[in-house]
Amino acid sequence: MQPTNTRDPDYFHKVVDCQWACPAHTDVPGYIRLIAQGQYTEAFLLNRESNVFPGILGRVCDRPCEPACRRGRVEDKPVAICRLKRVAADLADDYSDRLPKAPAKKNGKRIACVGAGPASLTVANDLLPLGYEIVIVEGLQVPGGLMRSNIPSFRLPAEVLDREIDDIVGMGAQLKLGHRIESMQKLLAEGFDAIFVGTGAPKGKELKLPGRYDDGARVHIGIEWLESVAFDHIKMIGEQVLIIGVGNTALECCRSSLRLGAKSVKVMARKPRQFFKASAWELDDAEEEHVEIVVNRSPKAFVTTGGKLSGMLFDVMEYDFDARGRITAERIVREEILPADDIVLAIGQENAFPWVERDLGIEFDKWDVPKVDLKTFESTRPGVFFGGDSAFGPKNIIWAVEHGHQAAI
C-alpha cells in the first residue's frame, strides 16, 4: 500500500463522495450548510468558485454528484444537491460587488476563445481576473452556445442564462457575435498567445434509412430543430410526433413538441429502459407531461403516403441478458408501423471541424476528434486547446466547465 499523498488536491476532494463525483469538485457540504443557515448569497458565491454557473446548473446539470451521495445508501433518494444549487441562485441578494474584477493593467497576453458556450466562458472567467485579454468569438448573434440553442427556455429561462453570462463578459471580455471562424490558419495569424476551442458538438447524426428524403421537410435533426425553436424559426409541429432516440436531447425535443401543439408524442428507444442515456429525472418530467416512452423499437424505414410522411416502420426487438444484465442476444419478433406527422432524429451528436486545416500540426484521431492532453487539454500544436464537447463529444455543462478550468490553468 502506498502512503496517501496529502499534497495532491484530489485527496481532499475524494474525502467527500459527492464533491469528488462532481467534475468541477464543487464544495457540496459547504454550500448546503450555508443554505441551511439562510446565507444564500454566500452559498451562491461558494458554488460559483468551482462551477461558475450556479443558476444554470441548478436547473439543467446532469447531477453526477447525486448517485454518489451517501444518503442514497440509507434512504430512498439522495440529497437534492442540484436543486439546492438553484435555491442558492434564486434567493441570492445582489452579489455584483463581490465578483472577481479584472485588473486595469493587463499582463500583455491575448487569448482567443472560439465559441461562447460554457467551456469558453469558464476560460474567460478564470483568466480575466489575472490580467489576460480575452476575445470570445461566437457564430450566433447571442452568447451561450448549446445552452442557448438546445435547452428550451421552459427549463432554462433566458434571464438566468443572460445574468450568469453577463457576470463573466462584464469583467471585460471582448465578445464578437455573429462572427463564424472559417479558418484556424487565419485565426493563428492574428497573433494570439493561445487559442481555446469550445465549439461543442454541433452536428446532429443522420438516420439514413429508406424513405428518409421522400418528405424531408417533416424529418428533423434534433439539435438543429431545437435551435430553430429557440430562435422562433419554428413555431408549430404536427399532431403526431415520433422522437427517435432516448438521450437528453430527445427529451428536450419531446417536451418542446408538446408546447408547439403536438397531441401525441412518442420517444422511440431501441433497447430497454435500463440502457437509456437520458437522466432519470428527465424521463420523469417527460412522462409527467404524458410523453410515451416506447422501448425495443429499432427504426427500419420512413413511411410516406402520396409523397407525404405518414409514419415510421420499426422492427420490434427482444433481448436476452446474462446474470449481470448485459445483452447477450437480440432478435426481431415482428414489424410495426407507427403514425407520424413529424419525426425528430435525436440519436446523437458529433464534432465538426471543417474549419481546422489538417496541416497545422493539430492531430486528429480516427473519429476526427482532436488529440489533446487529458490534463491540460492542449492539442498537439502548442498553444491550441480544445475543451467541452468539442474535445470529447457530447457531455454535460459541468464537464465543459471543468475542461475550461483545466485549460485555463
Task: Give residue spans per PLM region.
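Feature captures the FAD/FMN-dependent oxidoreductase FAD-binding
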Residues: 105, 110-114, 162-208, 301-313, ...
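Glycine-rich dinucleotide-binding loop and its adjacent helix/turn
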Residues: 88-104, 163-183, 204-260, 364-375, ...
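Iron-sulfur cluster-binding cysteine motifs and their immediate structural context
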Residues: 12, 16-37, 58-88, 135, ...
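Ferredoxin-type iron-sulfur electron-transfer modules in oxidoreductases and energy-metabolism complexes
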Residues: 1-9, 27-58, 75-102
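Rossmann-like dinucleotide-binding cores of NAD(P)H-dependent redox enzymes
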Residues: 133-176, 227-229, 254-301
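FAD-site-proximal beta/loop scaffold in flavoenzymes
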Residues: 215-239, 322-394
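N-terminal Rossmann-like FAD-binding beta1-loop-alpha1 element of flavoenzymes
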Residues: 110-135, 249-258
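A conserved FAD-binding loop/helix module that cradles the flavin
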Residues: 253, 390-409
